[in-house]
C-alpha cells in the first residue's frame, strides 16, 4: 500500500518571528498600511496595557487578556451554558468533596474529613465560567470559597488543608490549582488581598528546606504549576526573591528534561507537566529547557500517540505494548493538555500549540461527556465501541468501571473537567507585544481590549468554525485607530485568504503562521478570513497502517448508532467516589452506551488520490448551537468500506486491536457515514484499510 502521509512528529522550535513572506499596501489607504505573513509576532517590546513578563523573564509574543475582555458566543458559549446547567454548575450539590460540612478548606485549623485537590480542580473552571457568563449564583458561590481560603491563611503564610505524607512532609499539590483560582479571581475583581495572600505563601514556601519541598509524587511531578503562579505574581509585583523561589521549584520538581524518558508515564502528569522546562526557560534563557518540552511532547506521541485526536493512550498510565487506538486517556488529561497548549502558545508564539489544542478540543474533549454535560466518563479512546460500567482491565490499565458516563464517579475528572472549555475561551484572543490583537482559537464571540495608543475597541467575530471555513470580524471603535490584527493560519490550511471591507488583500499565507493586518481602522470596518478546508487521509504507519480522515481541523469517525441505557449512578462507581447524602440521584443518572449498529468496518481508500475516496455533505447548523452530537453534526462524510468479521469485541469487552492494513475481506462493499469525532461517544476513528 502506498504511503499516504507520514505521522512521525518532526518539528522545529520557532524562536523568532520569521521573515516577511508577503507584503502589500492596502488600496485606497494612505500611510502605507501593510499586510504581511509572519511565523509569529516580534517580542522586542512589551504590551503597554496588559500584564506581560517582566525582565529578566523572556519577552512574550502573546499576552493573556483579562477574563472580562472575552465574551464567547455561538457553540462555545453553548458548551459553557450546558456546563453551567449540568454537572459543573451543580457539582456542589453532588460531590462529597464539595460539602460545606467538615471540609478542611473551610476550617481555620485546616482539618476536616474532606479537602484535597477536588475543590480547586472544580473551582478553577466553575469560577471562570461564572466570571465569563456573569452568572450571579455561581459568582456568589465562587466568592464564598475564595473568601474562606483567604481568611483561613495562617500567620506564617501557609494555607489549605493540612496533609502530611508518611514521611512527615507537607503535601502542597492541592494548593497549586487553588493558586490558579486566586489568579482568576484577581483578574476579575482586582481584590488586593490576593497579591498579599500569594506573597505570604510564597515566602513560606521559600523557607522550606529543599529536602522537605515537593517530595511527594503528585507535587513533585507538578511543580511547574506552582512556578506558573510565582511568575504570575512576579509580573505584578516585581519582587526579585520570587525568581529565587522559581529556581527552587525547578530544582525540586521531577526531571522533565530526560532525553528519551519521562519521570513517570501517568497521562495527566505528562499532559500537565511536560511544559515545566519551557516554563522555566522564561527565566533561564537556556534553549535546552525549551527543547526539552518539545522533546517530551514528541516522545509520548511517537510511542503512544500514533492515533487521531491530539492525545495519547495512557489509561491511566502508558504501558509498553499498549499503543492501539483503543487505549484511552483521562478527561483530566485532555483538560491539562489543552491548558499546556494554551500556555505554550503564549510563551513561544508557536502556532503548533494552537493546532494541537484545537485537535484535542474538537476531536476528543466533547466526547468525554453526555451531550447535556450532566455526566462524564473517566476514559475516552479514539476507537471505543462500548462505554459501560464493566471492569475492562487489563485491556485498560485501571481496574473498575472507568468507561461509563457517571456524574457520581470519576473523582478527579468529575471536578477537573470544568476548566476545559472556559480556558479555551479565555485564550481565544490574546494581546500582542506591539499593542495589537491576535485571534488564536476561532469561535463566535467578541473581544474588548485596548490597542494602539490606548483606544478601547471591540471586535465581533462571527463564524461556525471549525464546521465552516469562513470567519468574519467587525471592528467597533470610538475613533480611528492604528493597530496590528493577527490572524492565525492553521498548519492544515493551504490558500488562506483575507479581505477588508469586501476587497481581497493579496497575501501569500502559508500554513502555520499569522497574517498581520496593520491598518488605520475605523468604526464598522470588516475583515473576512477564509481558511479553505480540504479532505486529507492520514496514515498511522506505526499503528498497523491504519488511517484517519480529516476535513480541516476535524477528524471523522464511523457513525455508530448509540444505545443509551440509564443506570443508577451509585451502583457502579470507582472506589474513591463519594457523594452527599441528599444528592438527588433521580436528576443525575449514569449511562452505559452500547453499539446498535455494526462498527467493524475498514475503509476503501484510493492510494493515488485518497481524498477522492470521500464526499463531504454539509448540513444545516443545529438550532440549539450544539454541533458536538451525531444528530446535530453540520458536516458528514460519505465513504465506502467493507466489514471485517474477525475484528470483534475482545475478551476484555473492548474494541479489538486493529488488524494490520491492508486487510483482505470477502464482505460486500458498503456505504458508510462518517461524523465529526468530537460528537461521537462511540467511535472508530483509526480505520483499517481494506482491499
Name the predicted role of every residue range.
Residues 34-136, 168-188, 192, 224-241, ...:
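Aromatic (Trp/Tyr) and acidic
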Residues 1-36:
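Bacterial Sec-dependent N-terminal signal peptides
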Residues 483-486, 517-534:
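C-terminal beta-strand-rich structural cap/linker in extracellular carbohydrate-active enzymes
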